[in-house]
Design a protein with these regions (language model features):
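Long, low-complexity, mixed-charge
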Residues: 34-59, 109, 114-119
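Acidic glycine-/aspartate-rich tracts in secreted/extracellular proteins
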Residues: 74, 96-99, 171-172, 362
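Extracellular beta-strand-rich solenoid/capping regions of secreted or surface-exposed proteins
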Residues: 78-86, 101-165, 173-191, 197-206, ...
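Secretory targeting and sorting signals
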Residues: 1-27
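Extracellular beta-rich repeat passengers
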Residues: 318-442
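Low-complexity, acidic Ser/Thr/Pro-rich repeat tracts that form intrinsically disordered stalk/linker regions
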Residues: 26-36
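Right-handed parallel beta-helix
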Residues: 162-172, 186-199, 220, 226-243, ...
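Acidic Gly/Asp/Thr-rich repetitive segments characteristic of extracellular carbohydrate-active
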Residues: 45-92
Length: 442
């Protein structure tokens, strides 16, 4: 792979992370390739919210001709859609597929997407607050940035249809530079894949975001929007060769080129997220994307279990409206960018039990939770450890938060009890969880 050169020198002639594209045609997958056929596995009864309703079976009922192995971006795009085709399908990803690759296999760079004369140098010069002020950018350069963004979006955004299983084969299967969208569909399984570096070449400057303005990007590694019955399992989510710690700053703010790792929004419902590794993103995951979206009430029911949340800055997850069960996860809290892990937002109903929080770099137990306008959070059986070693000790997450933030105190009223749980393990069993999560293990 080639490393994407960030625009520290203010040039758009940079190449996105690329892998050598192969030219093999999509073909029926050999389901005997692996000693255990994971392509037709379904989410077990009682395994989190994703097992509720009609359950999550993905493409397990696919006919043999609808089981396809892919190793290029064009093959992948064709295999997972269209959304109006509800036939069960299984898509087996062989190797690493780079979203920034043309149909002929040519790697695409940010410069290839830039249109209408856009350049970062000119954008920075035009909208520097010392020149432009603190109003929203507008005019030909902002229009060119937006048009360039849309050109890239047409290439890297891929929509998944209903009744689909996408599964990786081997240790290195995955998607890089792809923004996978599971929108307004049902019954989708995503397993044994790396989802890496959905890089936005054209972040927009918002001078009114926060006290000093922020750069905002558009692409999540995966976005669930209006989707029902989804299982995301044994996958790895990261920034690939473009970690947030190495991004430059412009106008005093980090030039943020990533959005979320796995965002769940707009009445998405009945989701199980299990045995995944989420790595070193600032804003990792939201459940519900707006306080004003009251139509989310009664939806956004999500279970997170046996995941490793590793070096994330915030939103692991941040919840609005939904009933969200967070159990048996391992959190590694580290780094200067850390803000909080569990965010209790408007009308959130977070239920956190038997999780391990490994506190590093001086991070305290009172920083694990933050109240973003919520009322209550139920938490029991959780434990902390320090710097990856020593004995674990019980922690009252709400009491620790309230002691640190008495002006934003949370209650502990239980408004619901999780039903779809196979077994909650004792917290001591979660200490070794990190070695059992992520892609390449199935």
């Amino acid at each position: 792979m080639r490393r994407l050169a960030l625009p520290v020198t203010l040039t758009m002639a940079v190449a996105l992370t690329a892998t050598a594209a192969t030219t093999a045609h999509a073909a029926p997958a050999d389901r005997d390739h692996h000693p255990r056929d994971i392509t037709r596995q379904v989410l077990a009864d009682g395994d989190g919210w994703g097992s509720a309703g009609d359950g999550t079976t993905g493409g397990s009922a696919a006919a043999d001709e609808d089981v396809v192995r892919v190793d290029t971006m064009e093959e992948f795009r064709a295999a997972v859609g269209p959304r109006d085709d509800d036939r069960p399908r299984i898509v087996v990803v062989d190797g690493l597929i780079d979203g920034n690759t043309a149909a002929d296999g040519t790697p695409l760079s940010c410069a290839d997407y830039a249109v209408d004369g856009y350049s970062l140098e000119e954008y920075l010069a035009a909208y520097d607050p010392e020149v432009w002020g603190w109003e929203d950018p507008e005019g030909p350069l902002e229009e060119a940035r937006d048009a360039s963004y849309r050109t890239q979006a047409a290439q890297i955004r891929v929509k998944v249809g209903s009744n689909t299983t996408v599964v990786g084969t081997g240790e290195d299967a995955g998607l890089t530079g792809v923004a996978l969208q599971v929108h307004d569909v049902e019954n989708v399984i995503l397993r044994n894949l790396s989802f890496s570096d959905a890089y936005d070449c054209f972040p927009g400057w918002d001078p009114k975001d926060g006290n000093t303005g922020n750069w905002n990007s558009e692409y999540d590694n995966i976005e669930l929007s209006g989707a029902t019955n989804v299982w995301v399992d044994h996958s790895t989510f990261d920034d690939g060769d473009n970690p947030g710690s190495e991004l430059p700053e412009y106008f005093g703010s980090k030039y943020e080129v990533h959005d979320g790792l796995l965002d769940i929004a707009r009445q998405a419902d009945l989701v199980t997220v299990s045995y995944n590794h989420f790595v070193e993103r600032d804003k990792a995951m939201i459940v519900g994307n707006s306080d004003s979206r009251t139509t989310d009430r009664g939806h956004l029911r999500v279970t997170y279990h046996h995941n490793h949340f590793d070096g994330l800055g915030q939103r692991a997850p941040r919840v609005r409206f939904g009933q969200v069960h967070v159990y048996n996860n391992h959190y590694t809290l580290a780094g200067d960018h850390f803000q909080y892990s569990l965010g209790a937002g408007k009308e959130s109903q977070l239920y956190a039990e038997n999780n391990v929080f490994d506190l590093r770099d001086g991070i305290g137990a009172g920083e694990i939770v933050y109240n973003w306008g919520g009322t209550d959070l139920v938490a029991h059986g959780n434990a902390v450890m320090y710097d990856g070693r020593g004995r674990m000790s019980a922690v009252d997450l709400v009491a620790e938060h309230n002691a640190l933030h008495p002006d934003r105190a949370l209650g502990t009223e239980r408004t619901w009890t999780p039903e779809y749980v196979q077994r909650v393990q004792p917290v001591w069993a979660i200490r070794s969880l990190p070695r059992r999560v992520g892609a390449g293990l199935l």
